[in-house]
């Protein structure tokens, strides 16, 4: 009687994981050497990720939960914060997809890359949500700043979370924009 193979093929031991991980790190370093601006992509993604967490940690520590973070800015912003958090994870995964030994992530990335300007759309969506958070924060607190466009005024409130998120989006977008414009920074 033949011994049964387990279904789903979960059985193969992955002995080359450490080697693949090392190769992945070398691959990533090569990617950064090729264009030093590439490091900004992942730094930016981390900033967006931290935008929802650092201010929350700070606020929890000081016992102030309203002002600081995307989760609480403007009352019920948890929805925005969670979306921004998830999208930042997508951005991080996007950057490491080519360098980690997980074919599923690489496959998904390949499919998404077929969508023109997918990365810009992703960053744009994050930007819009952060903008909404900024405006909601402005209206939720008396110290919001009013910015006037002709006769229309709009109140915005700057919180640490929002600043982190904007910095992250700008950092993640910069190399992509330069790339699209064909501007190369670094030793080519």
Whereabouts are the PLM-identified features?
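Cys/His-rich metal-coordination motifs, chiefly Zn-binding "fingers/knuckles"
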Residues: 1-5
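Compact integral membrane and secretory-pathway proteins
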Residues: 8-188
């Amino acid at each position: 009687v033949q011994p049964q193979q387990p279904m789903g093929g979960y059985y193969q031991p992955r002995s080359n994981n450490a080697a693949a991980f090392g190769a992945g790190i070398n691959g990533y370093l090569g990617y950064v050497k090729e264009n030093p601006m590439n490091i900004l992509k992942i730094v930016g993604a981390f900033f967006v990720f931290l935008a929802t967490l650092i201010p929350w940690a700070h606020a929890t520590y000081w016992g102030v939960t309203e002002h600081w973070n995307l989760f609480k800015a403007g009352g019920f912003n948890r929805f925005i914060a969670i979306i921004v958090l998830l999208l930042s994870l997508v951005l991080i995964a996007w950057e490491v997809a080519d360098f980690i030994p997980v074919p599923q992530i690489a496959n998904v990335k390949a499919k998404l890359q077929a969508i023109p300007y997918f990365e810009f759309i992703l960053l744009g969506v994050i930007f819009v949500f952060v903008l909404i958070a900024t405006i909601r924060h402005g209206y939720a607190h008396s110290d919001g700043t009013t910015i006037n466009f002709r006769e229309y005024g709009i109140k915005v409130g700057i919180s640490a979370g929002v600043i982190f998120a904007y910095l992250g989006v700008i950092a993640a977008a910069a190399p992509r924009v330069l790339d699209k414009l064909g501007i190369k920074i670094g030793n080519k």
